[in-house]
Amino acid sequence: MSNIYIQEPPTNGKVLLKTTAGDIDIELWSKEAPKACRNFIQLCLEAYYDNTIFHRVVPGFIVQGGDPTGTGTGGESVYGAPFKDEFHSRLRFNRRGLVAMANAGPHDNGSQFFFTLGRADELNNKHTIFGKVTGDTVYNMLRLTEVDIDDEERPRNPHRIKSCEVLFNPFDDIIPREIKKPKKEKAEEEIKKLKPKGTKNFSLLSFGEEAEEEEEEVNRVSQSMKGRSKSSHDLLKDDPHLSSVPAVESEKDDATGDLEDDAEDDSVEHDGSMEEDEKNLMRERIAKRLKKDASANVKSAGDGEKKPASRSEELRKEARQLKRELLAAKQKKESATKAEKGSEEEEAVPDGPVAEYRREKQKYEALRKQQPKKGTSREDQTLALLSQFKSKLTQAITEMPENCAEAEVEDDEGWMSHVLQFEDKTRKVKDASMQDSDTFEIYDPRNPVNKRRREESKKLLREKKERR
Protein backbone atom coordinates (compact mmCIF):
# COMPACT_ATOMS: atom_id res chain seq x y z
CA MET A 1 0.00 0.00 0.00
CA SER A 2 2.96 2.38 0.49
CA ASN A 3 3.54 2.76 -3.25
CA ILE A 4 -0.12 3.82 -3.65
CA TYR A 5 0.24 6.67 -1.20
CA ILE A 6 3.49 7.77 -2.79
CA GLN A 7 1.82 8.00 -6.21
CA GLU A 8 -1.08 10.10 -4.90
CA PRO A 9 -0.49 13.87 -4.69
CA PRO A 10 -0.56 15.73 -1.35
CA THR A 11 -3.92 16.94 -0.04
CA ASN A 12 -4.96 20.51 0.70
CA GLY A 13 -8.21 20.80 2.66
CA LYS A 14 -10.12 18.78 5.25
CA VAL A 15 -13.80 18.20 6.07
CA LEU A 16 -15.41 16.23 8.91
CA LEU A 17 -18.71 14.44 8.23
CA LYS A 18 -20.66 13.52 11.37
CA THR A 19 -22.84 10.55 10.44
CA THR A 20 -25.00 8.11 12.36
CA ALA A 21 -22.26 5.50 11.78
CA GLY A 22 -19.55 7.76 13.27
CA ASP A 23 -17.27 10.60 12.21
CA ILE A 24 -15.58 10.44 8.78
CA ASP A 25 -12.50 12.59 8.03
CA ILE A 26 -12.09 13.56 4.38
CA GLU A 27 -8.92 15.16 3.01
CA LEU A 28 -9.36 17.01 -0.30
CA TRP A 29 -7.22 17.33 -3.43
CA SER A 30 -8.11 20.97 -4.03
CA LYS A 31 -5.28 21.52 -6.56
CA GLU A 32 -6.10 18.51 -8.72
CA ALA A 33 -9.92 18.95 -8.59
CA PRO A 34 -10.60 22.60 -7.65
CA LYS A 35 -14.18 22.79 -8.92
CA ALA A 36 -15.32 19.63 -7.16
CA CYS A 37 -13.58 20.61 -3.89
CA ARG A 38 -14.99 24.15 -3.96
CA ASN A 39 -18.46 22.77 -4.62
CA PHE A 40 -18.16 20.22 -1.78
CA ILE A 41 -16.78 22.70 0.78
CA GLN A 42 -19.38 25.37 0.03
CA LEU A 43 -22.23 22.86 0.30
CA CYS A 44 -20.82 21.76 3.67
CA LEU A 45 -20.62 25.37 4.87
CA GLU A 46 -24.23 25.95 3.79
CA ALA A 47 -25.38 22.83 5.75
CA TYR A 48 -26.68 21.44 2.47
CA TYR A 49 -25.80 17.84 3.41
CA ASP A 50 -27.31 17.98 6.90
CA ASN A 51 -29.88 15.22 7.53
CA THR A 52 -29.34 13.71 4.07
CA ILE A 53 -29.23 9.92 3.77
CA PHE A 54 -26.89 7.51 2.01
CA HIS A 55 -29.52 6.35 -0.45
CA ARG A 56 -27.44 3.76 -2.34
CA VAL A 57 -25.28 0.98 -0.88
CA VAL A 58 -23.50 -1.61 -3.03
CA PRO A 59 -21.41 -3.92 -0.79
CA GLY A 60 -17.81 -4.17 -1.94
CA PHE A 61 -18.29 -1.33 -4.44
CA ILE A 62 -19.62 2.10 -3.30
CA VAL A 63 -21.75 3.99 -0.76
CA GLN A 64 -23.51 6.98 -2.33
CA GLY A 65 -25.12 10.03 -0.71
CA GLY A 66 -25.45 13.81 -0.97
CA ASP A 67 -28.98 13.94 -2.39
CA PRO A 68 -31.31 16.10 -0.24
CA THR A 69 -34.35 14.41 -1.78
CA GLY A 70 -33.05 10.92 -0.99
CA THR A 71 -34.15 9.57 -4.39
CA GLY A 72 -30.79 9.52 -6.16
CA THR A 73 -31.93 11.97 -8.86
CA GLY A 74 -31.85 15.27 -6.92
CA GLY A 75 -29.20 17.72 -5.81
CA GLU A 76 -27.52 20.65 -7.54
CA SER A 77 -24.09 22.26 -7.50
CA VAL A 78 -23.19 25.69 -6.13
CA TYR A 79 -22.58 26.90 -9.68
CA GLY A 80 -26.27 26.64 -10.56
CA ALA A 81 -25.57 24.05 -13.26
CA PRO A 82 -23.62 20.78 -13.60
CA PHE A 83 -19.86 21.34 -13.78
CA LYS A 84 -17.20 19.54 -15.80
CA ASP A 85 -15.25 16.43 -14.85
CA GLU A 86 -11.70 16.82 -13.50
CA PHE A 87 -9.47 13.82 -14.12
CA HIS A 88 -5.87 13.46 -12.95
CA SER A 89 -3.26 10.90 -13.94
CA ARG A 90 -2.16 10.29 -10.34
CA LEU A 91 -5.68 9.75 -8.99
CA ARG A 92 -7.10 6.30 -9.75
CA PHE A 93 -9.82 4.06 -8.30
CA ASN A 94 -7.30 1.53 -7.01
CA ARG A 95 -8.33 1.19 -3.35
CA ARG A 96 -11.08 1.82 -0.82
CA GLY A 97 -11.70 5.10 0.97
CA LEU A 98 -11.69 7.40 -2.09
CA VAL A 99 -14.33 10.14 -2.41
CA ALA A 100 -15.63 10.97 -5.90
CA MET A 101 -18.49 12.83 -7.57
CA ALA A 102 -21.52 10.85 -8.73
CA ASN A 103 -22.95 11.69 -12.14
CA ALA A 104 -25.36 10.42 -14.75
CA GLY A 105 -22.96 11.05 -17.64
CA PRO A 106 -19.96 13.13 -18.73
CA HIS A 107 -19.76 16.63 -17.18
CA ASP A 108 -22.94 16.11 -15.15
CA ASN A 109 -21.67 16.67 -11.59
CA GLY A 110 -24.00 18.08 -8.94
CA SER A 111 -24.03 17.54 -5.18
CA GLN A 112 -24.00 13.74 -4.96
CA PHE A 113 -20.79 11.93 -4.02
CA PHE A 114 -19.76 8.38 -3.10
CA PHE A 115 -17.14 6.43 -1.13
CA THR A 116 -15.32 3.49 -2.71
CA LEU A 117 -15.25 0.18 -0.81
CA GLY A 118 -12.60 -1.48 -2.96
CA ARG A 119 -10.76 -1.34 -6.26
CA ALA A 120 -12.95 -0.08 -9.12
CA ASP A 121 -10.92 0.31 -12.32
CA GLU A 122 -14.09 0.60 -14.41
CA LEU A 123 -14.76 4.05 -12.88
CA ASN A 124 -11.48 5.60 -14.04
CA ASN A 125 -11.93 8.66 -16.31
CA LYS A 126 -15.68 8.59 -15.61
CA HIS A 127 -15.95 10.12 -12.13
CA THR A 128 -13.97 12.94 -10.54
CA ILE A 129 -11.90 11.89 -7.51
CA PHE A 130 -11.57 14.86 -5.14
CA GLY A 131 -10.81 13.38 -1.70
CA LYS A 132 -9.97 10.40 0.49
CA VAL A 133 -11.03 9.07 3.90
CA THR A 134 -8.15 9.18 6.38
CA GLY A 135 -7.26 7.59 9.70
CA ASP A 136 -9.38 5.14 11.64
CA THR A 137 -12.54 6.82 10.35
CA VAL A 138 -12.35 4.48 7.37
CA TYR A 139 -13.92 1.84 9.65
CA ASN A 140 -16.86 4.18 10.30
CA MET A 141 -17.20 4.47 6.52
CA LEU A 142 -17.35 0.67 6.27
CA ARG A 143 -20.12 0.63 8.89
CA LEU A 144 -22.33 2.44 6.37
CA THR A 145 -22.69 -0.90 4.55
CA GLU A 146 -24.04 -2.73 7.63
CA VAL A 147 -27.69 -2.23 6.66
CA ASP A 148 -30.45 -4.26 5.01
CA ILE A 149 -30.61 -3.61 1.26
CA ASP A 150 -33.51 -4.22 -1.11
CA ASP A 151 -33.36 -5.33 -4.73
CA GLU A 152 -32.82 -1.75 -5.96
CA GLU A 153 -29.64 -1.24 -3.86
CA ARG A 154 -31.52 1.03 -1.45
CA PRO A 155 -31.07 0.49 2.31
CA ARG A 156 -34.23 -0.05 4.34
CA ASN A 157 -32.83 1.81 7.36
CA PRO A 158 -30.20 4.11 5.81
CA HIS A 159 -27.52 5.98 7.68
CA ARG A 160 -27.56 9.77 7.38
CA ILE A 161 -25.26 12.76 7.68
CA LYS A 162 -26.03 14.63 10.89
CA SER A 163 -23.78 17.64 10.21
CA CYS A 164 -20.65 18.77 8.37
CA GLU A 165 -17.63 20.68 9.69
CA VAL A 166 -14.94 22.26 7.51
CA LEU A 167 -11.65 21.83 9.41
CA PHE A 168 -9.40 23.42 6.79
CA ASN A 169 -10.70 25.57 3.93
CA PRO A 170 -8.20 26.19 1.11
CA PHE A 171 -10.61 28.60 -0.61
CA ASP A 172 -10.72 31.86 1.35
CA ASP A 173 -13.10 33.55 -1.08
CA ILE A 174 -16.03 31.18 -0.49
CA ILE A 175 -19.10 33.01 0.81
CA PRO A 176 -21.92 30.68 1.88
CA ARG A 177 -25.25 31.46 0.26
CA GLU A 178 -28.41 32.12 2.23
CA ILE A 179 -30.69 29.35 1.10
CA LYS A 180 -34.28 30.53 1.44
CA LYS A 181 -36.52 27.84 2.75
CA PRO A 182 -39.94 27.68 1.10
CA LYS A 183 -42.75 29.08 3.20
CA LYS A 184 -44.89 26.41 4.72
CA GLU A 185 -48.54 26.47 3.97
CA LYS A 186 -50.96 27.05 6.76
CA ALA A 187 -51.64 24.06 8.89
CA GLU A 188 -54.92 22.24 8.71
CA GLU A 189 -55.76 23.31 12.24
CA GLU A 190 -55.51 27.00 11.33
CA ILE A 191 -57.67 26.41 8.29
CA LYS A 192 -60.23 24.71 10.46
CA LYS A 193 -60.21 27.65 12.84
CA LEU A 194 -60.95 30.03 9.97
CA LYS A 195 -63.96 28.00 8.92
CA PRO A 196 -67.21 29.13 10.58
CA LYS A 197 -68.85 26.64 12.88
CA GLY A 198 -72.19 25.30 11.77
CA THR A 199 -75.31 26.09 13.81
CA LYS A 200 -78.15 23.69 14.36
CA ASN A 201 -81.56 24.97 13.28
CA PHE A 202 -84.07 22.95 15.34
CA SER A 203 -87.03 24.84 13.85
CA LEU A 204 -86.75 22.74 10.73
CA LEU A 205 -87.52 19.56 12.70
CA SER A 206 -90.99 18.43 13.65
CA PHE A 207 -89.76 17.67 17.15
CA GLY A 208 -87.50 20.74 17.28
CA GLU A 209 -88.40 21.89 20.80
CA GLU A 210 -87.68 18.48 22.34
CA ALA A 211 -84.41 18.15 20.43
CA GLU A 212 -83.33 21.62 21.51
CA GLU A 213 -84.03 20.83 25.18
CA GLU A 214 -82.06 17.57 24.94
CA GLU A 215 -79.17 19.40 23.29
CA GLU A 216 -79.06 21.99 26.10
CA GLU A 217 -79.16 19.23 28.73
CA VAL A 218 -76.30 17.35 27.07
CA ASN A 219 -74.18 20.50 26.81
CA ARG A 220 -74.81 21.37 30.46
CA VAL A 221 -73.88 17.86 31.67
CA SER A 222 -70.79 17.70 29.46
CA GLN A 223 -69.56 21.02 30.88
CA SER A 224 -70.15 19.90 34.47
CA MET A 225 -68.47 16.50 33.93
CA LYS A 226 -65.52 17.82 31.93
CA GLY A 227 -62.26 16.22 33.06
CA ARG A 228 -63.95 13.42 35.06
CA SER A 229 -65.06 9.92 34.25
CA LYS A 230 -68.77 9.60 33.57
CA SER A 231 -71.20 6.90 34.67
CA SER A 232 -74.93 6.37 34.90
CA HIS A 233 -74.88 7.63 38.51
CA ASP A 234 -73.57 10.99 37.33
CA LEU A 235 -76.03 11.44 34.49
CA LEU A 236 -79.17 9.97 36.10
CA LYS A 237 -79.05 11.16 39.69
CA ASP A 238 -82.82 11.07 40.29
CA ASP A 239 -83.42 7.58 38.89
CA PRO A 240 -85.00 5.45 41.68
CA HIS A 241 -83.87 2.21 40.02
CA LEU A 242 -80.19 2.98 40.65
CA SER A 243 -78.70 1.91 43.99
CA SER A 244 -76.91 4.46 46.13
CA VAL A 245 -74.30 1.86 47.15
CA PRO A 246 -71.23 1.68 44.84
CA ALA A 247 -70.84 -1.56 42.94
CA VAL A 248 -67.79 -2.96 44.73
CA GLU A 249 -68.57 -6.46 43.57
CA SER A 250 -67.44 -5.53 40.07
CA GLU A 251 -63.93 -4.97 41.36
CA LYS A 252 -64.07 -8.33 43.06
CA ASP A 253 -65.24 -9.93 39.85
CA ASP A 254 -62.34 -8.29 38.08
CA ALA A 255 -60.02 -9.52 40.81
CA THR A 256 -61.32 -13.06 40.45
CA GLY A 257 -60.92 -12.83 36.70
CA ASP A 258 -57.34 -11.64 37.15
CA LEU A 259 -56.67 -14.39 39.66
CA GLU A 260 -57.99 -17.02 37.29
CA ASP A 261 -55.91 -15.62 34.45
CA ASP A 262 -52.77 -15.50 36.62
CA ALA A 263 -53.36 -19.02 37.84
CA GLU A 264 -53.86 -20.29 34.30
CA ASP A 265 -50.76 -18.48 33.00
CA ASP A 266 -48.57 -19.77 35.83
CA SER A 267 -49.86 -23.30 35.38
CA VAL A 268 -49.02 -23.15 31.67
CA GLU A 269 -45.51 -22.02 32.49
CA HIS A 270 -44.84 -24.76 35.06
CA ASP A 271 -46.69 -27.79 33.83
CA GLY A 272 -48.25 -26.94 30.46
CA SER A 273 -51.93 -27.44 31.29
CA MET A 274 -53.86 -28.26 34.47
CA GLU A 275 -56.68 -30.71 34.75
CA GLU A 276 -60.23 -29.45 34.69
CA ASP A 277 -61.13 -30.76 38.14
CA GLU A 278 -58.19 -28.94 39.72
CA LYS A 279 -59.18 -25.66 38.05
CA ASN A 280 -62.77 -26.04 39.20
CA LEU A 281 -61.63 -26.73 42.77
CA MET A 282 -59.56 -23.57 42.83
CA ARG A 283 -62.39 -21.48 41.39
CA GLU A 284 -64.82 -22.80 44.03
CA ARG A 285 -62.49 -21.95 46.90
CA ILE A 286 -61.94 -18.42 45.61
CA ALA A 287 -65.67 -17.90 45.05
CA LYS A 288 -66.48 -19.05 48.62
CA ARG A 289 -63.97 -16.64 50.08
CA LEU A 290 -65.40 -13.80 47.99
CA LYS A 291 -68.95 -14.57 49.15
CA LYS A 292 -67.88 -14.51 52.79
CA ASP A 293 -66.23 -11.11 52.49
CA ALA A 294 -68.71 -9.47 50.09
CA SER A 295 -70.80 -7.83 52.83
CA ALA A 296 -67.74 -6.56 54.70
CA ASN A 297 -66.36 -5.05 51.52
CA VAL A 298 -69.64 -3.23 50.80
CA LYS A 299 -69.65 -1.68 54.28
CA SER A 300 -66.04 -0.56 54.12
CA ALA A 301 -66.25 0.74 50.55
CA GLY A 302 -66.38 4.34 51.69
CA ASP A 303 -63.09 4.10 53.60
CA GLY A 304 -61.00 4.37 50.43
CA GLU A 305 -59.49 2.33 47.65
CA LYS A 306 -56.53 0.92 49.62
CA LYS A 307 -58.53 -1.86 51.29
CA PRO A 308 -59.89 -3.35 48.03
CA ALA A 309 -56.43 -3.21 46.57
CA SER A 310 -54.91 -4.97 49.57
CA ARG A 311 -57.73 -7.49 49.53
CA SER A 312 -57.11 -8.25 45.87
CA GLU A 313 -53.43 -8.77 46.64
CA GLU A 314 -54.33 -11.23 49.39
CA LEU A 315 -56.58 -13.09 47.00
CA ARG A 316 -53.80 -13.29 44.44
CA LYS A 317 -51.41 -14.66 47.07
CA GLU A 318 -53.96 -17.25 48.11
CA ALA A 319 -54.48 -18.24 44.48
CA ARG A 320 -50.75 -18.69 44.00
CA GLN A 321 -50.56 -20.80 47.16
CA LEU A 322 -53.41 -22.98 45.90
CA LYS A 323 -51.68 -23.35 42.59
CA ARG A 324 -48.45 -24.45 44.30
CA GLU A 325 -50.32 -27.01 46.39
CA LEU A 326 -52.05 -28.42 43.33
CA LEU A 327 -48.77 -28.63 41.42
CA ALA A 328 -47.07 -30.37 44.36
CA ALA A 329 -49.90 -32.89 44.59
CA LYS A 330 -49.75 -33.52 40.87
CA GLN A 331 -45.97 -33.99 40.90
CA LYS A 332 -46.25 -36.36 43.85
CA LYS A 333 -48.85 -38.35 42.00
CA GLU A 334 -46.71 -38.52 38.85
CA SER A 335 -43.65 -39.64 40.82
CA ALA A 336 -45.70 -42.38 42.49
CA THR A 337 -46.96 -43.62 39.12
CA LYS A 338 -43.42 -43.63 37.73
CA ALA A 339 -42.16 -45.63 40.70
CA GLU A 340 -44.95 -48.15 40.29
CA LYS A 341 -44.26 -48.46 36.58
CA GLY A 342 -40.54 -48.97 37.26
CA SER A 343 -41.20 -51.68 39.84
CA GLU A 344 -43.55 -53.43 37.42
CA GLU A 345 -40.93 -53.37 34.68
CA GLU A 346 -38.29 -54.76 37.03
CA GLU A 347 -40.61 -57.57 38.03
CA ALA A 348 -41.44 -58.27 34.38
CA VAL A 349 -37.75 -58.60 33.41
CA PRO A 350 -36.02 -60.33 36.32
CA ASP A 351 -32.83 -61.25 34.51
CA GLY A 352 -31.01 -60.63 31.26
CA PRO A 353 -29.20 -57.76 29.52
CA VAL A 354 -32.03 -55.31 30.25
CA ALA A 355 -31.77 -55.97 33.99
CA GLU A 356 -27.98 -55.56 33.84
CA TYR A 357 -28.38 -52.29 31.98
CA ARG A 358 -30.81 -51.01 34.62
CA ARG A 359 -28.46 -51.97 37.44
CA GLU A 360 -25.61 -50.11 35.76
CA LYS A 361 -27.87 -47.12 35.20
CA GLN A 362 -28.91 -47.03 38.87
CA LYS A 363 -25.29 -47.32 39.90
CA TYR A 364 -24.18 -44.34 37.85
CA GLU A 365 -27.22 -42.29 38.84
CA ALA A 366 -26.30 -42.83 42.49
CA LEU A 367 -22.72 -41.75 41.75
CA ARG A 368 -23.97 -38.66 39.93
CA LYS A 369 -26.11 -37.67 42.90
CA GLN A 370 -23.12 -38.05 45.22
CA GLN A 371 -20.98 -35.88 42.98
CA PRO A 372 -20.69 -32.33 44.39
CA LYS A 373 -21.61 -29.25 42.42
CA LYS A 374 -19.15 -26.95 40.71
CA GLY A 375 -16.96 -24.90 43.03
CA THR A 376 -14.19 -25.41 45.56
CA SER A 377 -15.57 -28.76 46.71
CA ARG A 378 -15.59 -30.07 43.12
CA GLU A 379 -11.99 -28.96 42.66
CA ASP A 380 -10.90 -30.64 45.89
CA GLN A 381 -12.58 -33.86 44.81
CA THR A 382 -10.78 -33.76 41.44
CA LEU A 383 -7.39 -33.27 43.12
CA ALA A 384 -8.12 -36.13 45.53
CA LEU A 385 -8.96 -38.46 42.63
CA LEU A 386 -5.75 -37.46 40.85
CA SER A 387 -3.58 -38.15 43.91
CA GLN A 388 -5.34 -41.50 44.39
CA PHE A 389 -4.57 -42.47 40.79
CA LYS A 390 -0.89 -41.48 41.17
CA SER A 391 -0.49 -43.55 44.33
CA LYS A 392 -2.17 -46.52 42.67
CA LEU A 393 0.16 -46.25 39.66
CA THR A 394 3.34 -46.10 41.77
CA GLN A 395 2.15 -49.05 43.86
CA ALA A 396 1.58 -51.16 40.74
CA ILE A 397 5.11 -50.38 39.48
CA THR A 398 6.79 -51.27 42.78
CA GLU A 399 4.90 -54.53 43.18
CA MET A 400 5.89 -55.77 39.71
CA PRO A 401 8.51 -58.62 39.84
CA GLU A 402 11.86 -58.09 38.19
CA ASN A 403 11.76 -61.09 35.87
CA CYS A 404 8.22 -61.38 34.67
CA ALA A 405 8.32 -64.33 32.26
CA GLU A 406 4.65 -65.14 32.44
CA ALA A 407 2.27 -63.70 29.92
CA GLU A 408 0.59 -60.54 31.05
CA VAL A 409 -3.09 -60.71 31.83
CA GLU A 410 -5.16 -58.15 29.95
CA ASP A 411 -7.35 -56.38 32.48
CA ASP A 412 -8.16 -52.83 33.57
CA GLU A 413 -5.06 -52.59 35.80
CA GLY A 414 -2.63 -54.67 33.74
CA TRP A 415 -1.38 -51.70 31.76
CA MET A 416 -0.04 -50.10 34.96
CA SER A 417 2.64 -52.78 35.42
CA HIS A 418 3.40 -53.16 31.73
CA VAL A 419 7.03 -52.65 30.67
CA LEU A 420 7.83 -51.26 27.27
CA GLN A 421 10.45 -53.47 25.58
CA PHE A 422 12.10 -53.08 22.18
CA GLU A 423 13.84 -55.56 19.89
CA ASP A 424 17.63 -55.46 20.09
CA LYS A 425 18.90 -54.35 16.67
CA THR A 426 22.58 -53.54 17.27
CA ARG A 427 24.52 -52.86 14.08
CA LYS A 428 28.05 -54.09 13.44
CA VAL A 429 30.78 -51.50 13.12
CA LYS A 430 32.50 -51.63 9.72
CA ASP A 431 36.24 -52.12 9.78
CA ALA A 432 38.22 -51.07 6.74
CA SER A 433 40.85 -53.77 7.24
CA MET A 434 38.30 -56.57 7.45
CA GLN A 435 36.85 -57.96 4.26
CA ASP A 436 33.19 -58.80 4.51
CA SER A 437 30.29 -59.40 2.17
CA ASP A 438 28.81 -56.08 3.22
CA THR A 439 32.06 -54.19 2.70
CA PHE A 440 32.03 -51.75 -0.21
CA GLU A 441 34.98 -51.53 -2.55
CA ILE A 442 36.56 -48.12 -2.37
CA TYR A 443 39.40 -47.21 -4.81
CA ASP A 444 41.26 -43.92 -4.55
CA PRO A 445 44.15 -43.44 -7.04
CA ARG A 446 45.73 -40.81 -4.82
CA ASN A 447 46.08 -43.24 -1.92
CA PRO A 448 49.82 -44.04 -1.32
CA VAL A 449 49.06 -47.75 -1.12
CA ASN A 450 47.46 -47.67 -4.54
CA LYS A 451 50.41 -45.68 -5.88
CA ARG A 452 52.89 -48.32 -4.66
CA ARG A 453 50.80 -51.07 -6.19
CA ARG A 454 50.76 -49.31 -9.54
CA GLU A 455 54.54 -48.83 -9.47
CA GLU A 456 55.12 -52.47 -8.55
CA SER A 457 52.89 -53.66 -11.36
CA LYS A 458 54.73 -51.41 -13.84
CA LYS A 459 58.07 -52.74 -12.63
CA LEU A 460 56.96 -56.34 -13.12
CA LEU A 461 55.84 -55.58 -16.66
CA ARG A 462 59.25 -54.10 -17.53
CA GLU A 463 61.06 -57.13 -16.19
CA LYS A 464 58.90 -59.44 -18.27
CA LYS A 465 59.65 -57.44 -21.42
CA GLU A 466 63.37 -57.53 -20.75
CA ARG A 467 63.33 -61.29 -20.32
CA ARG A 468 61.74 -61.70 -23.70
From Swiss-Prot:
It is found in: Nucleus. Gene3D superfamilies: Cyclophilin-like. One of its GO terms (biological process) is protein folding. The modification Phosphoserine is found at residues 273, 343. Residues 206-229, 309-342 form a coiled coil. The keyword Translocase does not apply. Residues 256-268 have a biased composition (Acidic residues). Residues 11-166 form the PPIase cyclophilin-type domain. It holds the Pfam family Pro_isomerase. It comes from the Eukaryota. Residues 231-241, 269-287, 302-342, 356-368, 453-468 have a biased composition (Basic and acidic residues). Part of the activated spliceosome B/catalytic step 1 spliceosome, one of the forms of the spliceosome which has a well-formed active site but still cannot catalyze the branching reaction and is composed at least of 52 proteins, the U2, U5 and U6 snRNAs and the pre-mRNA. Recruited during early steps of activated spliceosome B maturation, it is probably one of the first proteins released from this complex as he matures to the spliceosome C complex. Component of the minor spliceosome, which splices U12-type introns. Belongs to the cyclophilin-type PPIase family. This is Spliceosome-associated protein CWC27 homolog. It comes from Rattus norvegicus (Rat).
